[in-house]
Amino acid sequence: MIALLILSLTCSASTYRLQGFTNAGIVAYKNIQDDNIVFSPFGYSFSMFMSLLPASGNTRIELLKTMDLRKRDLGPAFTELISGLAKLKTSKYTYTDLTYQSFVDNTVCIKPSYYQQYHRFGLYRLNFRRDAVNKINSIVERRSGMSNVVDSNMLDNNTLWAIINTIYFKGIWQYPFDITKTRNASFTNKYGTKTVPMMNVVTKLQGNTITIDDKEYDMVRLPYKDANISMYLAIGDNMTHFTDSITAAKLDYWSFQLGNKVYNLKLPKFSIENKRDIKSIAEMMAPSMFNPDNASFKHMTRDPLYIYKMFQNAKIDVDEQGTVAEASTIMVATARSSPEKLEFNTPFVFIIRHDITGFILFMGKVESP
């Protein structure tokens, strides 16, 4: 059996304009082929959305299509996005922090209308040829607490514009695993069988068997304490088929199918960190913004900018107490009943989800914990 783990932020009917936003991040994830993966669909989609705001011409048309938006829906969708971010409240047990920064070179002429509308979200002017890496890292760390987000491989003397967003999540399980019951156990993947620390909890959770086409998957929801954020775990024989089936709407539908059951749940502790060049993935969705001849960001500047680099760094740690996950996404532009036993002892995928808004914060796959 192969397992799927989903940590996510759910789409409600009131945020229908943002289902395309969520789906863009899911599609990006599906184009990653590594074994152990941690990825932030929200971080990816947020960067694409914020590059849509200054875009024009074919660049705007492609980005609107990526977000499944009509031109007249862009303003309302932006309002809904900001409203959704406000719902990610920090509590005594859960900390969620999102930041956005747009760094523009001093030589680029920003239109006053764009500056007036968006500068409050984090618009900075600087000289990219004078210690830009340290200056940007200092600003991002001051705002997010995350250090060394960019390096000299991401920025160079050609850089004129950099979009950076960060996400940090720390959540305590509503029903923590008992650390005294963690035992070494077998975990089997395509490479063979290994011994891993397996956590254990017996408690009432929401779960069910869901059917996709003719295939069945056992799914269970692990809530975080006082957060409206949950981790969804699923296990079945064909997780590639499960992953291919994921959309924002289907995640909503599956979550509504879950009912209360008592589980004896076993889940391995795991930690994953990825640093990934995601330009080729974004280029499949909106190719013109990466083309020096076709890119247009004329709602921000008349300077002929185009995106030439895009990265995402992400990591996640899951243990008996809860989850810590963080990600930074960087776009760089230049000119031009009785306890039911459920053991995750084979590879699984994860998604992090806020059960109100529908934004998927983190998603990934564990082949070898």
From Swiss-Prot:
SUPFAM superfamilies: Serpins. Keywords: Host cell membrane, Host membrane, Membrane, Protease inhibitor, Serine protease inhibitor, Signal, Virion. It is found in: Virion membrane; Host cell membrane. CDD domains: serpinO_SPI-3_virus. It is a peripheral membrane protein. GO terms for cellular component: extracellular space; host cell plasma membrane; membrane; virion membrane. Residues 1-15 form the signal peptide. GO terms for molecular function: serine-type endopeptidase inhibitor activity. Its main location: virion. Induction: Expressed in the intermediate phase of the viral replicative cycle. InterPro entries: Serpin_dom, Serpin_fam, Serpin_sf, Serpin_sf_1, Serpin_sf_2. Prevents cell to cell fusion via its interaction with A56 protein. The A56-K2 complex associates with components of the entry fusion complex (EFC) presumably to avoid superinfection and syncytium formation. Belongs to the serpin family. Orthopoxvirus OPG040 subfamily. Interacts with A56 protein. This is Superinfection exclusion protein. It comes from Vaccinia virus (strain Ankara) (VACV). The gene is OPG040.
